[in-house]
Amino acid sequence: MPSNRWIKNALPGALGILLFLLIWELLGRTGVLGLTWPPLTSVIATLSEPSKTALFLRATSASLTSAGTGYLAGGALGLVAALAGHLIPTLQEGLSRFAAVVNSVPPIALASVFLVLVTTESTPTAVAAIKVFFIIFIAVQSGLRSATPAQHDLFTSLGTGRFKRLWLLEVPTMLPVAMSGLKIAVPVALIGAFVGEWFGASRGLGVLILNAMQNFQISMLWSAVLLATLVSLAVYFILTMVESIVRLRLT
């Protein structure tokens, strides 16, 4: 049955997460790694403190807004660039090199540049967009090339035009690969936003992480990191479900 199969596939991952959480708590309780590794229960207690809940919610909302806007902008730019290179072969090599060069720039260096070009509040979005652009560009570019020669021969024999072939053949074969790229881009967008927030943003999880490091607030630091991880995993899980639906519709 599908439900039994789903449970069977999910069980190893769930057990692995549970084991990791137990080890985290044990290491924190025993103090093997020192004061900088607090117990998981202490981190959760910090997250649930009424005086800090509003702070965490505001920071999460700010980071999600920056990362989400950058994710959408970078994804759209990557999609358009990949389609342009696919439809106009003379642009392909130049676009690929441009994407590779942009991706090779470290996020901290990008944030420094954008700090001069745009406002401090826009820097997290800009960094996230640039890092997402490369992932989506490569995913869409690879997906558009994934149709087999036999499939292309069939459409050629039917006299299908270029744009009709793109819509009926290349886009459907591209979607599963693009969905994988969209999943991979989620943590990248969040990391880009966090790094951008370190350069003068007024709020965000990146700001909380930086302030906690500077003031040696260990529980606050781990709480912000845990919250960022949970947000990333939640979005990743949603996109995984969407990917499964897309694959079922295309098979």
Predicted regions and their residues:
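Transmembrane alpha-helical segments of polytopic membrane transport and secretion proteins
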Residues: 1-18, 237-251
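Periplasmic/extracellular loop-to-transmembrane helix junction in inner-membrane transport proteins
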Residues: 5, 29-72
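Transmembrane-helix boundary motif in ABC transporter permease subunits
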Residues: 69-99
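C-terminal transmembrane helix and the adjacent membrane-cytosol boundary/short C-terminal tail
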Residues: 89, 145, 176, 222-251
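Generic hydrophobic transmembrane alpha-helix motif, especially the helices
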Residues: 100-135, 142-143
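Glycine-rich helix-loop "coupling/hinge" segments at transmembrane-helix boundaries
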Residues: 116, 144, 191-228, 247-251
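Transmembrane alpha-helices
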Residues: 126-130, 163-196, 222-223, 227, ...
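Short cytoplasmic-facing helical segments at TM-TM junctions of multi-pass membrane proteins
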Residues: 139-184, 205, 209
